């Protein structure tokens, strides 16, 4: 039996717990193993209800150090507390699951090295492209292939805003507000619209594809804040649609990583 500790119990954490409970009978039959959530760390304990069988604490470090936990699911976000939790958990021989692309892009090299020394697994599939298994594809299916380049739309917020500016003739600000209302953009969407989120993702993909350390510090970054309705109009008249993409390629000149509108 694998005992899971959820570090963070917001929308994603609650949905994950529900999913694990709903698949309680199918998971063991598919992989001959069982998973249960045994601990939750949540800053808002007084505002929520919890399963009585689950230990709840406000201190995430309790999970990282607990002998009752085998797997830490990091749902905190950011790189401050999340970093401390992940490093501490690995030192205590706990496997890690995280969709935190900032954490992986900025500290992945250190995390993976420490994980190898402690013989634990670090899963970060959802850090890039959500449910599309691109990490597994690059790591396993294409492990022996020589990848020359990767290009793609890797930030949903930018993609939605640009699509709304084009199809609905919305201004940038109106499209951004609509993205917030529909839950496609964070309350503070800075990392999305300035290109940082895409830079984190393309760094992760490049490090796997080319088997290098994270190239984040060398990524050329440009967001979509300066794109106007006039830009959209002219591109449409020429038969094009502006998109924000992440690009990485390798050549005799070296490895290039960039994220910008095209």
Where are these regions (language model features)?
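Conserved anion/nucleotide-ligand pocket segment
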Residues: 140-200, 205
């Amino acid at each position: 039996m694998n005992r899971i500790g959820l570090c963070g119990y917001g929308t994603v954490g609650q949905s994950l717990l529900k999913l694990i409970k709903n698949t309680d009978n199918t998971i063991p039959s598919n992989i001959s193993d069982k998973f249960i959530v045994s601990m939750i760390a949540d800053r808002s304990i007084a505002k929520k209800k919890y399963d009585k069988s689950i230990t709840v604490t406000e201190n995430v470090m309790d999970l990282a150090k607990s002998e009752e936990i085998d797997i830490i699911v990091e749902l905190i976000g950011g790189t401050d507390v999340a970093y401390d939790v992940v490093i501490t958990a690995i030192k205590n021989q706990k496997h890690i699951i995280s969709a935190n692309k900032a954490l992986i892009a900025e500290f992945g090299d250190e995390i993976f090295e420490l994980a190898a020394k402690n013989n634990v697994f670090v899963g970060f599939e959802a850090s890039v492209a959500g449910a599309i298994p691109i990490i597994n594809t690059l790591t396993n299916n294409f492990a022996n292939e020589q990848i020359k380049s990767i290009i793609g739309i890797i930030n949903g917020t930018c993609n939605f805003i640009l699509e709304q500016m084009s199809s609905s003739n919305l201004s940038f600000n109106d499209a951004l507000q609509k993205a917030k209302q529909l839950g496609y953009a964070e309350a503070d969407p800075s990392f999305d619209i300035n290109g940082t989120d895409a830079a984190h993702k393309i760094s992760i993909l490049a490090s796997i594809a080319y088997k290098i350390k994270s190239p984040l510090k060398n990524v050329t970054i440009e967001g979509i804040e300066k794109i106007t309705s006039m830009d959209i109009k002219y591109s449409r008249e020429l038969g094009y649609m502006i998109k924000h993409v992440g690009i990485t390629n390798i050549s005799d000149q070296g490895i290039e990583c960039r994220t910008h509108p095209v």
